[in-house]
Amino acid sequence: MAKILAVNAGSSTLKWKLFDMPAEVQLAEGLVDRLGQPQSKVKIKYGDGQKYESDTPIANYQEAVASLMGNIKALGLVEHLHEITGVGHRVVAGGETFAESVVVDDATLLQIQNLRDYAPLHNPVEADYIDVFKKMMPWATEVAVFDTAFHQTMQPENFLYSIPYDYYKKYGARKYGAHGTSVRYVSARAAEMLNKPLEDLRMIVMHLGSGSSVTAVQGGQSIDTSMGFTPLAGVTMGTRSGDIDPSLVAYLMKKLDVPDVGQMIHILNNDSGLLGISGISNDMRDLEADEDTKPRAKLALDIFVNRVVKYVGSYAALMDGVDVLVFTAGIGENGDEIRDKIMRSLDYLGAKIDNDINYKSHGVEADLSTPDSTVKTLLVPTNEELMIVRDVMALS
């Protein structure tokens, strides 16, 4: 038996889950929050619903990892830290360099750092954390699992932008997508639920959360996805605009007197989407509560549904039909009203859901389809961390 950590690191947070493998039993999950602030927060759930919380200053990545390791031992999750034989790291951008998960050596770490332009807010932080784990747990196998890797099966007609081809060859300007680890997990799990080979299915995965994407999966491979060079593209999201005309960026910069493109991208990433349209919130639950009394709340919801439906329709056309629709992630797993609204517009595909089941299903696996539906509609809670530790086991 081996114990494997799955790590999701950000500039001010460190999220982790500890698994007993190969049994795939989750032993604990934790969060280090507000890193670098006077009162950082540590939260851990373990055992049979037990919780541990503390407020303590954690200044840097080294202290965050030391806190994680110390708490894992203090809570009796391991007797010796050497029981943890592997650590899997979520890495946002792998570019064309990485089409699958890899064991991290010094050369790999440098490659991840060199991809920082593809995800400047994420890759440098993730590379730094990998380096810290390598130094503090030198006995463990460190594995990088890339959000973009699953989408490396896309063909050029789906991943290239219609800009000068040299920009792709020289600068890597193309669609990379995101949420690949999530889509890989839920598509495989959906096939298992249906007791059918994944390779025989045409599937559309709707990963709907604060960040949302739609992915066409055919024969077990990603053939197209809504997110683009970065996760800013695609459907409307919580605070992200999704697809817009690039000329609008220059137009708004002039009108708003925004001096640099980075500031404009910040607006599109942080002040747009559901929040920007509604002027109320980026939280779907808040908008649903207000949709009958506040027109812009309803408008934001309508736009969100509209964009998802458009992508689903285009991907059904791309695959010459669809066998399975899958809802996952925070909104997809818990947003019964949003699922209902989306599915009302997909009846033409032969996809029908039983709303008695739909409105009772939250965060659990469920077949939402009616008996006469020719397209299956499934709710599959995502589990990126389990996918990550499986990759660690496979590479250890």
From Swiss-Prot:
Substrate binds at R90. It is found in: Cytoplasm. Signal peptide: none annotated. Homodimer. ATP binds at K15, H207, L208, G209, S210, G211, D283, M284, R285, G330, I331, G332, E333, N334. One of its GO terms (biological process) is acetate metabolic process. Mg(2+) binds at N8, E384. The active site is at D147 (proton donor/acceptor). The record marks H179, R240 as: Transition state stabilizer. It comes from Lacticaseibacillus paracasei (strain ATCC 334 / BCRC 17002 / CCUG 31169 / CIP 107868 / KCTC 3260 / NRRL B-441) (Lactobacillus paracasei). This is Acetate kinase. Pfam families: Acetate_kinase (PF00871). InterPro entries: Ac/propionate_kinase, Aliphatic_acid_kin_short-chain, Aliphatic_acid_kinase_CS, ATPase_NBD. It is an enzyme of class 2 (transferase). It catalyses: acetate + ATP = acetyl phosphate + ADP. GO terms for cellular component: cytoplasm. Belongs to the acetokinase family. Pathway: Metabolic intermediate biosynthesis; acetyl-CoA biosynthesis; acetyl-CoA from acetate: step 1/2. Keywords: ATP-binding, Cytoplasm, Kinase, Magnesium, Metal-binding, Nucleotide-binding, Transferase. Mg(2+). Can also accept Mn(2+). Its cofactor is Mg(2+); Mn(2+). Its main location: cytoplasm. Catalyzes the formation of acetyl phosphate from acetate and ATP. Can also catalyze the reverse reaction. GO terms for molecular function: acetate kinase activity; ATP binding; magnesium ion binding. Its EC number is 2.7.2.1.
